[in-house]
């Protein structure tokens, strides 16, 4: 069984569940899970936990995510992307200045309250929002507080005078639960114009980037060397403060004992035999208690 994290560069047209299903067949392994759903039309970084690494999935969700994408002013849909029903169209007689676009983006940086698109996987009373939408049932969408760390215009926007549409490219870095589609829609509202997301690619998630990723096709063509594409579990904890345990302290840790450490970090990665075995969290006065045991007791 493989233990570690494989970063897939997801193609358009696939769900995150599709990727997990294909990996289970390719690797002949059931214990696999993804960390962070990507909509079918969105491409890019999809971290997949294998074997013992599935214990990390909740921690993986907590890390910031980064995206590059394109949006368009002059059109709005109910899904906030090109897959949905058109709700509003307005031909622009002249382009919006890039300065105005940047100023609107800056207003959306920080802690903001978002409402997910009606076509999304958020559950309300046990049912996903897109199911209500497909059945034509009105439902109140729950609001959520998210963090947007960066929202930048990455190139001069492009205005099409014949269509009265203006396209722009952007980069976003945000917390879990942030809908980039909603950010594009919110940008339009700040500008007083309909807006829609036209393209999105995730470039980073759970601490992994596109340069760490492999496509399913490339993996399938090189199955004899599948381990070459798998990141070790320890790679996820590269930015944690790490403590190497001696045999006596390891005996305590593997039995779940609290330990005393001369540290002030909130969480520490405890290593034994050059491998992270557990994550401990601070309880005050130098005491640390178990937060996550990564491997079975040895």
From Swiss-Prot:
The active site is at residue 39. It catalyses: uridine(55) in tRNA = pseudouridine(55) in tRNA. Its EC number is 5.4.99.25. It holds the Pfam family TruB_N. Responsible for synthesis of pseudouridine from uracil-55 in the psi GC loop of transfer RNAs. GO terms for molecular function: RNA binding; tRNA pseudouridine(55) synthase activity. The keyword Disulfide bond does not apply. Belongs to the pseudouridine synthase TruB family. Type 1 subfamily. CDD domains: PseudoU_synth_EcTruB. NCBIfam families: TruB. It is an enzyme of class 5 (isomerase). This is tRNA pseudouridine synthase B. One of its GO terms (biological process) is mRNA pseudouridine synthesis. InterPro entries: PsdUridine_synth_cat_dom_sf, PsdUridine_synth_N, tRNA_psdUridine_synth_TruB, TruB_C. Keywords: Isomerase, tRNA processing.
């Amino acid at each position: 069984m493989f233990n570690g994290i494989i970063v897939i560069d997801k193609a358009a047209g696939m769900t995150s569940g599709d990727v997990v299903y294909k990996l289970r067949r390719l690797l002949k392994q059931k214990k696999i899970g993804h960390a962070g759903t990507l909509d079918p039309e969105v491409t890019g970084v999809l971290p997949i936990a294998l074997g013992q690494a599935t214990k990390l999935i909740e921690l993986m969700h907590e890390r910031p995510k980064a995206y590059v994408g394109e949006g368009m002013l002059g059109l709005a849909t109910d899904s906030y992307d090109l897959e949905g029903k058109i709700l509003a169209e307005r031909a622009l007689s002249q382009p919006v200045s890039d300065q105005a676009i940047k100023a609107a983006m800056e207003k959306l940086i920080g802690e903001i309250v978002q409402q997910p698109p009606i076509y999304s996987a958020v559950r309300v009373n046990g049912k996903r929002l897109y199911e209500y939408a497909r059945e034509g049932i009105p439902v109140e969408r729950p609001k959520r507080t998210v963090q947007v760390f960066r929202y930048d215009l990455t190139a001069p926007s492009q205005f099409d005078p014949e269509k009265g549409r203006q396209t722009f490219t952007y980069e976003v870095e945000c917390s879990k639960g942030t809908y980039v589609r909603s950010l594009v829609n919110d940008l339009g509202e700040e500008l007083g114009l309909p807006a829609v997301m036209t393209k999105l690619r995730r470039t980073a998630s759970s601490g992994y980037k596109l340069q760490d990723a492999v496509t399913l096709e490339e993996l399938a063509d090189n199955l004899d060397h599948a381990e070459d594409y798998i990141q070790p579990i320890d790679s996820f904890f590269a930015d944690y403060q790490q403590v190497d345990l001696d045999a006596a302290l390891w005996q305590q840790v593997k039995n779940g004992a609290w330990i005393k450490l001369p540290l002030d970090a909130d969480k520490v990665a405890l290593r034994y035999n050059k491998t992270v075995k557990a994550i401990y969290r601070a309880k005050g006065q130098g005491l640390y208690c178990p937060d996550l045991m990564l491997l079975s007791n040895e």
